[in-house]
Amino acid sequence: MQSITIRRPDDWHLHLRDGAILEGVIADTSRTFARAIIMPNLVPPVVTTADAKAYRERILKALPDGHRFQPLMTLYLTEQTSPDDVEAGAASGLITAVKLYPAGATTNSHGGVRDMEKAMPVLERMAKIGLPLCVHGEVTTPDVDIFDREAVFIDTVLDPLRRRLPELKVTMEHVTTAGGIDYIKAAQGNLAGSITTHHLIINRNAILVGGIRPHYYCLPVAKRENHRLALRAAAVSGDPRFFLGTDSAPHVDPLKECACGCAGIYTSINTMSCLAHVFEEEGALDRLEAFASLNGPAWYGLSPNEERITLSKQADPVVFPAKIETGAGAVTVFDPMVPLHWQVSASA
């Protein structure tokens, strides 16, 4: 039986939600991942250090007995965010990063930033203290095609910001385009990118061919095949500027299967099996550890995990549940549309 053992991975972009959904999904992450950067777009959002502290306590309370997992908390950047509160949260060790959502870019982002100038005092303080900014890299102006949002964001928001504050450390989250990959590669320091599991596997055909398939709809939306291949090449390259951020985003089925469905794909339960499949296809299993376990901690100034996991290739496909049942309703699990043969187990 073929197997590989790697350091226990981390997830550098995760939605856990709250309440019954949090309680229903957290084990799928904490079973495999040691740490995760937790997204702050709750209702209401996590905008202060006190909010983050309370949310972290709810996450830890929901952990199953025996699971060792560290939630890395973020703040939701608004035009009213206090630089002093951000600095205090970072100094306490509670706040790992601040998240920029352009208003209206994704789920629960209506309270995000509309005028970047109003957020500059916080961003200047973050640059000074070395606190990373995580960005949802899309513009939301109505005259921009949804498939062009990332490219326009780079040109009109991200690049001007980085020129103005070159000391600011920026994570371009869930990169979806070849242009985004090229922009990160060309950058001179202080820029890295997370890549999701699902964007390595699906292109936009998955959403639209054969009928509307809401469980493949996410934001940023999946792009053309050439972009998917560029993401794959970056992920398997070993380049330390690229690392795993699943953007696993649970929604109960009625919020996905409706006339105006929510964006988000739930991948926490089968991400490592999917990634092993992708890296094997690309002849790069030896670089899976870098992408999932090493590059992210290095970027965020943390040590890699000492624990290991083993992925073993099974003769028969590994069976994952089609849905996760939560107290709020069922959440559909990402279907990669190919059999998965890699199974995760803990290792000494």
Curated annotation (Swiss-Prot):
CDD domains: DHOase
Enzyme class: hydrolase
Family statement: Belongs to the metallo-dependent hydrolases superfamily. DHOase family. Class II DHOase subfamily.
GO MF assignments: dihydroorotase activity; zinc ion binding
GO biological process: 'de novo' pyrimidine nucleobase biosynthetic process; 'de novo' UMP biosynthetic process
Co-factor: note: Binds 2 Zn(2+) ions per subunit.
Cofactor(s) for this UniProt protein: Zn(2+)
Lineage, broadest ranks: Bacteria, Pseudomonadati, Pseudomonadota, Alphaproteobacteria, Hyphomicrobiales
Protein name: Dihydroorotase
Gene that encodes the chain: pyrC
